[in-house]
Amino acid sequence: MKIVEVKHPLVKHKLGLMREGDISTKRFRELATEVASLLTYEATSDFETEKVTIEGWNGPVQVDQIKGKKVTVVPILRAGLGMMDGVLEHIPSARISVVGIYRDEETLEPVPYFNKLATNIEERIAMVVDPMLAIGGSMIATIDLLKEKGCNQIKVLVLVAAPEGIAALEKAHPDVELYTAAIDEKLNDKGYIVPGLGDAGDKIFGTK
């Protein structure tokens, strides 16, 4: 599995700000969008381009444009919505596919409850966004669903990943690509990433 930990100074700086324990909902939400935007820049670096002739200000001119890539952004509800706009800043024409999965707090197993996928998803590159890759169950279940529907070009964008989640994802789906702002130390006994960000969904939505 291709694993990219994006170590750009802006990414490290913004993620560091997100780790503050008393960060406001507004600030956390803004930073989640900004980091997602920077991850998108990295995740699309392998998109092919082609020469296209357009009418410029002084006549025809050849320009580079992305070659035939249809993209769908796949936020995992609910926390993934906090990263969606960061992707759409760069790919505003992307279709949105929504997958609802929550983690059972006792068993830590993923529980699917909703999905609405873009049309012709088998022809699209899926960019799955979720702030945390902890145990990996929700991400694996989402990718299972996408592959069942014929989507086999999948990139995963997360703010923070735990080694345990990376290992689980690689075992289940070695063909996907993972882009993360940080690979943290470990999971604690409650399945939270340490040092992590805390509950990203609560911080994005202002709930507890």
Curated annotation (Swiss-Prot):
Binds 1 Mg(2+) ion per subunit. The magnesium is bound as Mg-PRPP. Pathway: Pyrimidine metabolism; UMP biosynthesis via salvage pathway; UMP from uracil: step 1/1. 5-phospho-alpha-D-ribose 1-diphosphate binds at residues 78, 103, 130-138, 199. GO terms for biological process: UMP salvage; uracil salvage. Its EC number is 2.4.2.9. Allosterically activated by GTP. Catalyzes the conversion of uracil and 5-phospho-alpha-D-ribose 1-diphosphate (PRPP) to UMP and diphosphate. This is Uracil phosphoribosyltransferase. It comes from Vibrio cholerae serotype O1 (strain ATCC 39315 / El Tor Inaba N16961).
